[in-house]
């Protein structure tokens, strides 16, 4: 977390937490979608 704050000194903890949450949810959604496509294709 300290490394992120060093890279983005203007970002406070709330913005960084929201951004990380959005990225994590997007990756989770994409992996879930690909898993469903694999199941549907079989």
Swiss-Prot record:
Lineage: superkingdom: Eukaryota
Record localization: Plastid, Chloroplast thylakoid membrane
GO biological process, one term: photosynthesis
Pfam families recorded: PetM
Keywords: Chloroplast, Electron transport, Membrane, Photosynthesis, Plastid, Thylakoid, Transmembrane, Transmembrane helix, Transport
GO molecular function: electron transfer activity
A GO term from the CC aspect: cytochrome b6f complex
Membrane topology: Single-pass membrane protein
Stored SUPFAM superfamilies: PetM subunit of the cytochrome b6f complex
Transmembrane regions: 19-37
InterPro entries: PetM_cyt_b6/f_cplx_su7 (IPR012595)
Quaternary organization: The 4 large subunits of the cytochrome b6-f complex are cytochrome b6, subunit IV (17 kDa polypeptide, PetD), cytochrome f and the Rieske protein, while the 4 small subunits are PetG, PetL, PetM and PetN. The complex functions as a dimer.
Database matches in HAMAP family: Cytb6_f_PetM
Primary role: Component of the cytochrome b6-f complex, which mediates electron transfer between photosystem II (PSII) and photosystem I (PSI), cyclic electron flow around PSI, and state transitions.
Sequence similarity: Belongs to the PetM family.
Name by which UniProt lists this protein: Cytochrome b6-f complex subunit 7
Organism from which the protein derives: Thalassiosira pseudonana
Gene behind this protein: petM
């Amino acid at each position: 977390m300290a490394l992120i704050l060093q890279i983005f000194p203007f970002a406070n903890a709330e913005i960084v937490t929201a951004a990380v949450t959005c990225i994590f949810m997007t990756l989770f959604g994409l992996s879930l979608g690909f898993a469903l496509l694999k199941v549907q294709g079989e």
